[in-house]
């Protein structure tokens, strides 16, 4: 079933919804970020991963500084319309530390 951006429940969590970013080919989970309506519209329009930075309080495109962009192949919405998956083709590491994925620390 297809959903429109207007059907996403941004109000449930104060205007933001979590975005799981997954490699479309390897299925690796690359990161977890957040999107608001504006950044989701930009992602849909441009085909690049756009998010809302909670720490900087601004829109940002993955790779705008590092060059490690993510080309969106598909956007999936969960059954409650309050979480999203970007299936992407990354051009480099997902993590700002240089690691391939952000989930590289094991909880002890």
Task: State what each model feature region is.
Residues 2-16, 22-30, 35-108:
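C-terminal binding/interaction regions
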